[in-house]
Amino acid sequence: MKHLTEMVRQHKEGKTNGIYAVCSAHPLVLEAAIRYASANQTPLLIEATSNQVDQFGGYTGMTPADFRGFVCQLADSLNFPQDALILGGDHLGPNRWQNLPAAQAMANADDLIKSYVAAGFKKIHLDCSMSCQDDPIPLTDDIVAERAARLAKVAEETCREHFGAADLEYVIGTEVPVPGGAHETLSELAVTTPDAARATLEAHRHAFEKQGLSAIWPRIIALVVQPGVEFDHTNVIDYQPAKATALSQMVENYETLIFEAHSTDYQTPQSLRQLVIDHFAILKVGPALTFALREALFSLAAIEEELVPAKACSGLRQVLENVMLDRPEYWQSHYHGDGNARRLARGYSYSDRVRYYWPDSQIDDAFAHLVRNLADSPIPLPLISQYLPLQYVKVRSGELQPTPRELIINHIQDILAQYHTACEGQ
């Protein structure tokens, strides 16, 4: 994918540019992202994780081919050029099968890689850092790298078989915290040391050589590291550049490599920009986008309660709460404390476990009901000012139509705008 190698080349030349990766499968989030990229005439990187999308369907029920079809159909409907769309696979490896013996988990990981590459995903994050059922804890760098090299070989062969040539770009390594936000309350976070980053790179370089893959090293464009950013349910650990100086300087010695930062959600615009300047030039964002979606929906539900008789309301928030209580598997092991603390977390936690529930048919019906109720007649401006003040300013200036859907999309785009600005470069 020329967009990514070109971005890395420009960054290495001192342009201080980057790219953000939208990590969400929600149609409204994806529509917001596609429309934003279209308006700003930039490429768009959309990523699926190994939890969301796999050869068996993942938690979204989509295979990689399904996900690609879904995104491309949406892009076509919005007249977004497919050659400006980059699809990535995140944390691809034995992640989903850690409860199985390593041989079985890695066989599944081989098939996972094949399914992503055959579907046309071009940015591949190889992550074999997790221990399987019969593995030591933690794994050595050498075992992690050997497994990643095995998957890279599968990826290269699959790409040549389906597309005639291998043009994949790879990301290696992993951040220390679990994907998708920390489970526990945070206070301090260890930044990856330069020595650890170098050890990961050298182990991978050696493992790739052993597999006869030395030639693809320039296509390994990024190493995932922990620059010292994370969030839990109610707190954000902000980027502190001074703590990451040595790590930032270390990557300057590698001609074709930058860093990828995960869990950048909820960082300030200033921190996002500084991350990119410091060579953490691929910024992953996911929960912050569905958090913004949830904020907009809760605001619209509050407006609905002001305008619509109680018996005709969608009851979106109550429906959501009921479904989350009936099916607690996506939040129960994450949210702790008494009943009130867990209730607040279900609705408002930064980790946004509510994102797993939007596809539910009852919740989707309530959402459609809410939009119908508010689309029948214009939403009074004072209520938009009360509940969506940033959108109110744009409505008043004529930039934004005050329809439920446009208000939601625009609220999500406020977050995307922060990432776009951080990645623009000079």
From Swiss-Prot:
GO terms for biological process: carbohydrate metabolic process; D-tagatose 6-phosphate catabolic process; phosphoenolpyruvate-dependent sugar phosphotransferase system. Pathway: Carbohydrate metabolism; D-tagatose 6-phosphate degradation; D-glyceraldehyde 3-phosphate and glycerone phosphate from D-tagatose 6-phosphate: step 2/2. GO terms for cellular component: plasma membrane. It holds the Pfam family GatZ_KbaZ-like. InterPro entries: Aldolase_TIM, GatZ/KbaZ-like, GatZ_KbaZ_carbometab, TagBP_ald_KbaZ. It comes from the Bacteria. Forms a complex with KbaY. Component of the tagatose-1,6-bisphosphate aldolase KbaYZ that is required for full activity and stability of the Y subunit. Could have a chaperone-like function for the proper and stable folding of KbaY. When expressed alone, KbaZ does not show any aldolase activity. Belongs to the GatZ/KbaZ family. KbaZ subfamily. This is D-tagatose-1,6-bisphosphate aldolase subunit KbaZ. It comes from Escherichia coli O7:K1 (strain IAI39 / ExPEC). The lineage of its organism: Bacteria, Pseudomonadati, Pseudomonadota, Gammaproteobacteria, Enterobacterales.
